[in-house]
C-alpha cells in the first residue's frame, strides 16, 4: 500500500486480543478494534491505532474536557479524535481485559482458541444438516466457525450448546445483514 501512496487500514474487530498483531512489522497505518470481543472489555469500548506522524481529520468533534475554554477542538493526537467525554469506566474495564490477556500471553490464548475451534469443527463437520460457511481448516483462519444446523433458529442452537455442552457461542446477525441475505440465512 505504501508503495502506491495508499494507507493500510486494518479492521481487527475479530482478531485484536486473540491473534498477535505487530502494526510496525505489518506496515499498518490505521488499526481499528472493538473492545468487547477478544479484548474482554465492556460493550461500547474499542480503539483506533493511528501510526505516529499520521493525522486524521475527525468527522465529528466535541468537548475534550481538557481545554474547555478553547473555541477550537484540540488538534493534537489522540485528543483530536476524541469527541466528547471519555467512557472512563468502559476504558478501565478494557484495560483490565488487556492486562489479563497480556499476562496469559496472546500466543498462548490463540493456540488454545485454535485447538478448541479445531476440536469443535472435528466433532460437528460430519453431523447431518450441519452447514459450515468457509473453511475452518485453512492455515490463516481465526478460530471462528460460522454454521447453521438445518433450519433451526441460531439462538436455539446457541442455547443448546451452552446448556448441554458448556460451549459459549454467539448467535444472530453479527452486524452483517447483507451477508445473511446472500447466504439465505436471514430467518435463522
Predicted regions and their residues:
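Pyridoxal 5′-phosphate
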Residues: 1-188
Amino acid at each position: 500500500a505504501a508503495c502506491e501512496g495508499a494507507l493500510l487500514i486494518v479492521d481487527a474487530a475479530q482478531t485484536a486480543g486473540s491473534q498477535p498483531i505487530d502494526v510496525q512489522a505489518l506496515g499498518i497505518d490505521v488499526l481499528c478494534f472493538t473492545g468487547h470481543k477478544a479484548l474482554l472489555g465492556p460493550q461500547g469500548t474499542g480503539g483506533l491505532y493511528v501510526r505516529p506522524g499520521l493525522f486524521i481529520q475527525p468527522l465529528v468533534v466535541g468537548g475534550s474536557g481538557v481545554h474547555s475554554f478553547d473555541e477550537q477542538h484540540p488538534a493534537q493526537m489522540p485528543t483530536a479524535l476524541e469527541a466528547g467525554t471519555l467512557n472512563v469506566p468502559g476504558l478501565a474495564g478494557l484495560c483490565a481485559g488487556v492486562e489479563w490477556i497480556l499476562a496469559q500471553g496472546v500466543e498462548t490464548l490463540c493456540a488454545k482458541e485454535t485447538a478448541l475451534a479445531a476440536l469443535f469443527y472435528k466433532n460437528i463437520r460430519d453431523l447431518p444438516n450441519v452447514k459450515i460457511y468457509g473453511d475452518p481448516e485453512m492455515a490463516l483462519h481465526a478460530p471462528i466457525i460460522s454454521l447453521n444446523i438445518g433450519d433451526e433458529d441460531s439462538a436455539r442452537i446457541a442455547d443448546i450448546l451452552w446448556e448441554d455442552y458448556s460451549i459459549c457461542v454467539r448467535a444472530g446477525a453479527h452486524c452483517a445483514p447483507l451477508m445473511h441475505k446472500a447466504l439465505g440465512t436471514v430467518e435463522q
